[in-house]
């Protein structure tokens, strides 16, 4: 990582699994540790770390909407708990090591046809959909954000179909992110 100024860390197990001790914690906790330490040792200035809207799972259904980064977390399960850890340790690295850390609370980025069908069945999932192109725009904005950004939690989704579930004001302000797409834009590349 020598000479790297910004690192977008996307390596993780992205869902709950039957055996979290063996299949979730190693990539999402131990892998994160190794990534953060390598970045720190190499002098990486900006880390963009992927969290998830799943840290607010129950609030996603209960409201009031839109949720923002100040709403207390209500995780769905162990996957979301690993993302809560990521958010906390990211804050520690920003405070202790002077790194710029942006936490990306991502909407649903489907990875296969089954997930696309799940999203198609529920408007709430369509409202938190994040298209591949909007994800790219968001991450570019995070990497290019002002160097004085110390620690931020930003939500990222495409345009909602019905209800704005996540407030994107901070993402607009910090990462100049403005979603351009809406469900089902971009799903054709998943097949």
Annotate each language-model stretch with its function.
Residues 1-27:
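NAD(P)H-binding glycine-rich loop region in Rossmannoid oxidoreductase-like domains
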Residues 6, 23-34, 42, 73, ...:
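Glycine-rich NAD(P)-binding loop of the Rossmann-fold in SDR/ketoreductase-type enzymes
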Residues 26, 62-97:
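Catalytic helix-loop patch of NAD(P)-dependent Rossmann-fold dehydrogenases
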Residues 34-74:
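Conserved Rossmann-fold NAD(P)-dependent oxidoreductase catalytic core, especially the SDR/UDP-sugar
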Residues 51, 87-112:
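Conserved beta-loop-beta element that borders a ligand/cofactor-binding pocket
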Residues 106-115, 129-151:
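Alpha-helical substrate-binding/gating segment
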Residues 183-191:
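Amphipathic terminal alpha-helices
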């Amino acid at each position: 990582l020598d000479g790297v100024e910004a690192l977008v860390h996307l390596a993780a197990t992205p869902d709950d699994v039957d055996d979290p001790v063996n299949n979730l914690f190693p990539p999402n906790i131990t892998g994160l540790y190794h990534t953060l330490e390598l970045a720190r040792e190499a002098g990486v200035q900006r880390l963009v770390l992927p969290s998830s809207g799943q840290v607010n799972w129950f609030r996603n259904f209960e409201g009031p909407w839109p949720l923002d980064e100040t709403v207390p977390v209500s995780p769905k399960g162990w996957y979301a708990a690993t993302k809560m850890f990521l958010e906390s340790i990211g804050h520690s690295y920003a405070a202790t090591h002077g790194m710029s850390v942006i936490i990306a609370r991502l909407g649903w980025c489907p990875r296969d046809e089954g997930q696309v069908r799940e999203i198609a069945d529920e408007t709430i999932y369509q409202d938190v959909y994040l298209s591949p192109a909007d994800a790219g725009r968001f991450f570019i904005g995070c990497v290019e954000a002002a160097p004085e950004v110390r620690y931020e939690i930003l939500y990222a989704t495409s345009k909602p179909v019905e209800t704005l579930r996540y407030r994107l004001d901070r993402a607009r302000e910090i990462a100049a992110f403005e979603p351009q797409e809406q469900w089902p834009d971009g799903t054709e590349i998943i097949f």
